[in-house]
Curated annotation (Swiss-Prot):
This protein's name: Dihydrolipoyllysine-residue acetyltransferase component of pyruvate dehydrogenase complex
A GO cellular-component term linked to this record: pyruvate dehydrogenase complex
Disulphide bridges: none
Catalytic activity: N(6)-[(R)-dihydrolipoyl]-L-lysyl-[protein] + acetyl-CoA = N(6)-[(R)-S(8)-acetyldihydrolipoyl]-L-lysyl-[protein] + CoA
Required cofactor(s): (R)-lipoate
Organism the protein comes from: Cupriavidus necator (strain ATCC 17699 / DSM 428 / KCTC 22496 / NCIMB 10442 / H16 / Stanier 337) (Ralstonia eutropha)
NCBIfam families the record matches: PDHac_trf_long (TIGR01348)
Protein family membership: Belongs to the 2-oxoacid dehydrogenase family.
Length: 553
């Protein structure tokens, strides 16, 4: 007599074609509430779609490879006998009961967590599914022997390397014995405490406060929901919220698993269930907010407002520096504000790796000095950076992945060679670009660099003179240092950093000879470039500087 209902894809954000990568059920299967039906995979996360209630699968409407979106029918489910009793009082309106399965599982999750609670027998409360962790320390124990607790009360707090979570009691009762202490390491299935169950009274007691129509435990909830679901939920949540400290929201193991599969830190999600419990709908709403670019304001207001933002960092400390002495406050220049934000974004978003090497520039430096002597009257001063720009062009031709940019799933390989160089100015760092460096000689590049550097110092660079770069060079040659990690100038995928050259004794087979050595620091984007390719690029670049005739090859 149970009526088959449609189980549909819940709210998964703004995705309208998410592929099904796994189907977990087939016709005839008996499933429980929260059992996974299918697994979906977006470009950002893999998630299981759970069943909102127990029953028997009558028909599966999708297969692996199908694309689904919110509202797509997944399976036809014949509800189990227990929930089937609910439609009787609401026979006049079966549609609302089927149309709103999502709110129902949230309250049902608590009774489902304590099926083994008999009348007043003892039960073992164990660590639920906490993912792949096998040794999570207990940092707080909230109960002691003799305490009377309610369902969803926190019993212990665990802390992994990524999050802190409370483990809630699956039901109410009296704590007979606590099996763990602060500092113990626990894993899924570890016994936390022995509870003398009040299942027959605790869970129904909470339910009985709201509905009056029937004495059976879960069935009465849908009856008032048919008339006014929102008002029914509000009174239940209000007293619960009043009794909660608000320090940590709780979530059932199934909801924690659901959140984990979506890549959501459950501690950031605000709970709307009883006692601040986090429901699946809360997690889905959080994900929808993040994917729509709203940064899930309700969920993250506290964390972001504390100064940690999305990275979950500690709040930035506030200091009154005047307590320690005299200070002066200066506003950041516009260039520093803009470049600082860009550098921070690039450092956080790009997986940087830096290879350090060195190049023998003894002969090249002698050649540079000779050129400067020859061009003394023309006023052109050749710098080592001009040679490095020409060497960079040759290296980019040999290793085209370095002359590229990421565009979603595509790699854009550039056929032009525009090389940027970092210029230090009184107002901050800028990167002028030498356009078509492959078509210019060292003297022309030196002249153009001098002109661009002057414009940069005077604050007169035009936007197009800082755009279109393929690769950048950051030179500290005139200042000092040995090696450093330059930050990639996105959307480029690599940057070369150079420091001050120094004399180094090198064994030539017969004796040690002084050689002028230039430190090289190549930072590269690991999404595009592999370590071996980066090492070859650095080696080849050094060979070009050591013997500039190789440029002609």
């Amino acid at each position: 007599m149970s009526q088959a209902i449609e189980i549909k894809v819940p709210d998964i954000g703004d995705y309208d074609a998410v592929p099904v990568i796994e189907v977990h059920v087939k016709p005839g299967d008996s499933i429980n509430a929260e059992d996974a039906l299918v697994t979906l995979e977006s470009d950002k996360a893999t998630m299981d779609v759970p069943s909102p209630q127990a029953g028997v699968v009558k028909d599966v409407r999708i297969k692996v490879g199908d694309n689904v979106s919110e509202g797509s029918v997944l399976v036809m489910l014949e509800a189990a006998n227990e929930p089937a009793a609910a439609p009787a009082p609401a026979a006049a309106a079966p549609a609302p009961a089927a149309a709103a399965p999502a709110p129902a599982p949230a309250p049902a999750a608590a009774p489902a967590a304590a099926p083994a609670a008999g009348g007043g027998g003892t039960i073992e409360v164990k660590v639920p599914d906490i993912g792949d962790y096998d040794a999570v320390p207990v940092i707080e124990v909230h109960v002691k022997a003799g305490d009377t607790i309610n369902a969803e009360d926190a019993v212990v707090t665990l802390e992994s390397d990524k999050a802190t979570m409370d483990v809630p009691s699956p039901q109410g009762g009296v704590v007979k014995e606590v099996k763990v202490k602060v500092g113990d390491n626990v894993a899924e299935g570890t016994l936390l405490l022995i509870l003398e169950g009040a299942a027959a009274s605790a869970a129904p007691a909470a339910a009985a406060a709201a509905p009056a129509p029937a004495a059976s435990a879960p069935a009465p909830a849908p009856a008032p929901a048919a008339a006014a679901p929102a008002p029914a939920a509000a009174p239940a949540a209000a007293p619960a919220a009043a009794g909660v400290t608000g320090k940590a929201a709780h979530a059932s193991p199934s909801v924690r698993k659901f959140a984990r599969e979506l890549g959501v830190d459950v501690s950031r999600v605000p709970g709307t269930g009883p006692k601040g419990r986090i429901t699946q709908e809360d997690v889905q709403g959080y994900v929808k907010g993040v994917m729509s670019g709203q940064a899930a304001a309700p969920a993250q207001a506290a964390a972001a407002g504390a100064g940690g933002g999305e990275l979950g960092l500690l709040p930035w400390p506030k200091f009154d520096f005047t307590r320690f002495g005299e200070v002066e406050s200066k506003a950041l220049s516009r260039i520093k504000k803009i470049s600082g934000a860009n550098l921070h974004r690039n450092w956080v978003m790009i997986p940087h790796v830096t290879n350090h090497d060195e190049a023998d520039i003894t002969e090249l430096e002698a050649f540079r000095l000779q050129l400067n002597k020859e061009n003394e009257k023309s006023g052109i001063k050749v710098t080592m950076l001009a040679f490095m720009i020409k060497a960079t062009v040759a290296a980019l031709k040999k290793f085209p992945n370095f002359n590229a940019s990421l565009d979603g799933d595509n790699l854009v390989l550039k056929k032009y060679f525009n090389i940027g160089f970092a210029a230090d100015t009184p107002n901050g760092l800028v990167v002028p670009v030498i356009k078509d460096a492959d078509k210019k000689g060292v003297l022309e590049i030196s002249q153009e660099m001098s002109e661009l550097a002057k414009l940069a110092r005077d604050g007169k660079l035009k936007p197009d003179q800082m755009q279109g770069g393929c690769f950048s060079i950051s030179s500290l040659g005139g200042l000092g240092g040995t090696y450093f990690t330059p930050i990639i100038n996105a959307p480029e995928v690599a940057i070369m950093g150079v420091c001050k050259s120094y004399q180094k004794p090198v064994w030539d087979g017969k004796q040690f000879a002084p050689r002028l050595t230039l430190p090289l620091s190549l930072s590269w984007d690991h999404r595009v470039i592999d370590g071996a390719e980066a090492a070859r690029f650095n080696t080849y670049f050094g060979q070009l500087l050591a013997d500039f005739r190789r440029i002609l090859l």
